[in-house]
């Protein structure tokens, strides 16, 4: 790659990665986009509500079959089981808990090889959306935010809403009901769809081309110096960390691709808006890439990774688990996230590590903010905060230090998502030996740094 001239490099990049990636991406999603738009137009016709719900069920079923063929039966079975439990518990005040337990048992049975591992993991995205919607609806019914148990066609319409069933994101039952009302088409709506779709394709290109093309082209200047380094240990350590960062960035952009694509499909189908005085603001946001790549803190990374899911975990898991204590609630929240994403050792290890990293970072920065009276909390302070030091050089330096530490943690955690691993291994999940090997190569650095931060927090307490 380093022997290419600049013109040859960009020509190879265009023909070997950019164009094929965009073409394959559009080939995969054009039918889903068409179905979303067709449903959007259908709901503008003023049909009876039950026909609107039935149409989105039909669109959702067709989309599932297009992507997963007959494997979609496992998603259908989960949705039927959820409505059965909801109907049987319709007079209970703990419907959210009953639905959560039912879904937990179902997902655990699937993870324990009731179904072929590769098949099960292919379905986990759609299963996750169905599970999140069912649980949120149960708790909203318990809290009185939804007045009555939906009819079967309303319930299935919500779960199989064509704009979210394949790629997400999670939306509330209220947002779904607003979507099927068939709001007017507008320039703002079309602009939002086009922007989200363009960003999705850009992130897909970056995710696919970072490893084989972009990263090796831009890094060699530093890499050549490393290769001339007489100290092999230092050279090897730096190369391993660069590879870890490469894997992390590629994984990040694959997540942004799904996030922006889910924005496009949900908005195209009519969801994801807020009502202003004289117009609708199409403002659905799933991911904030800049907050992840240039973070203030790991807490900001976690919330910006997937905003709807972060809201769901906070509102329906963390708040309900707070009675167990803050740290226990954090662990329960990350455990729920691991189960929803498809329980595998490497994912559980990443999420458990994230739980400790974010908790230690939060309490340490909170303690330092109190001692120094400075705006160095994990989240940005409000304009009327009581801290004496807000924008000074020392405050900026500390925030930059914690931001650099967050990038360090992200590189370490992202090293598990190796861009060179074959698809079958990725679908089955990485085992314990692989996880231990990858983190051993990096000397377990992130865990040791987190432990050191916790010791420091205890010492200054």
Curated annotation (Swiss-Prot):
Active site: 341
Effect listed in the UniProt record for changing residue 306 to A: Does not affect acyltransferase activity
Ranges of the Extracellular topological domain: 39-66, 117-152, 220-252, 359-396
Expression sites by tissue: Expressed in brain, heart, kidney, liver, lung, muscle, spleen and testis. Isoform 4 is strongly expressed in kidney, liver, lung, spleen and testis. Isoform 1 is strongly expressed in brain, heart and muscle and poorly in kidney, liver, lung, spleen and testis.
Subunit field text: Interacts with WNT1, WNT3, WNT3A, WNT4, WNT5A, WNT5B, WNT6, WNT7A and WNT7B.
Entry's transmembrane regions: 18-38, 67-87, 96-116, 153-173, 199-219, 253-273, 338-358, 397-417
Protein name per its UniProtKB record: Protein-serine O-palmitoleoyltransferase porcupine
Domain of life per record: Eukaryota
Mutagenesis / variant outcome for changing residue 228 to C: Does not affect acyltransferase activity
Effect of residue 305 to A: Impaired acyltransferase activity
Subcellular location: Endoplasmic reticulum membrane
Pfam families noted in UniProt: MBOAT
Catalytic activity: [Wnt protein]-L-serine + (9Z)-hexadecenoyl-CoA = [Wnt protein]-O-(9Z)-hexadecenoyl-L-serine + CoA
Effect of residue 341 to A: Abolished acyltransferase activity. Impaired ability to interact with WNT3A
Keyword Cytoplasm: no
Stated family: Belongs to the membrane-bound acyltransferase family. Porcupine subfamily.
Keyword terms of this UniProt record: Acyltransferase, Endoplasmic reticulum, Membrane, Transferase, Transmembrane, Transmembrane helix, Wnt signaling pathway
Primary location recorded for the protein, binned into one broad class: endoplasmic reticulum
Entry's Gene Ontology molecular function annotations: O-acyltransferase activity; palmitoleoyltransferase activity; Wnt-protein binding
Physiological role: Protein-serine O-palmitoleoyltransferase that acts as a key regulator of the Wnt signaling pathway by mediating the attachment of palmitoleate, a 16-carbon monounsaturated fatty acid (C16:1(9Z)), to Wnt proteins. Serine palmitoleoylation of WNT proteins is required for efficient binding to frizzled receptors.
Stored InterPro entries: LPLAT_7/PORCN-like, MBOAT_fam
Cellular component, GO annotation: AMPA glutamate receptor complex; endoplasmic reticulum; endoplasmic reticulum membrane; glutamatergic synapse
